[in-house]
A protein has these predicted regions:
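Acidic, low-complexity Ser/Thr/Gly/Pro-rich repeat segments typical of extracellular/periplasmic
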Residues: 2-129
């Protein structure tokens, strides 16, 4: 057990969009949102944190941009990390976003465990190219 400083609580994953287990997610989805209970976008931790998130289609890792809204720009968004696939999502495919344990809050607390969000896209109204 890691000794905590008085007043410090561990970093927790709160929610995602799309949610874990979602099906019928639009293949036109441009950005997934990951929400935590602490500031994970501060400059002091951002270089590390943007490397702690990966995304796969099935067993194939896909290229993503991991982005934020700086806490100095909009403090209310300090708990959100955004994941943007560089190429569009395929219809009727399973995706997973993995958040690694070394994700760190501004106060130094780490996530401490791997979090996986899985979702499946639905049909595209226009055929995939």
């Amino acid at each position: 057990m890691i000794a905590q400083q008085p007043g410090q609580k561990p970093l927790n994953f709160v929610s995602s969009y799309p949610r874990n287990g979602a099906t019928g997610v639009s293949p036109d989805l441009k950005t997934a949102r990951l929400v935590f209970d602490k500031n994970v976008v501060n400059d002091a931790v951002w270089t590390n944190n943007r490397q702690q998130i990966k995304m796969w289609r099935g067993t194939t890792q896909i290229s993503i941009n991991v982005t934020r809204i700086k806490d100095t720009v909009d403090f209310s968004k300090r708990n959100n990390i955004y994941v943007k696939p560089k190429k569009g999502l395929r219809s009727l495919s399973w995706y997973k976003i993995v958040i690694y344990p070394n994700l760190t809050a501004k106060n130094g607390e780490k996530l401490g465990k791997t979090v996986t969000i899985r979702f499946k896209t639905g049909r595209r109204s226009q055929p995939d190219e």
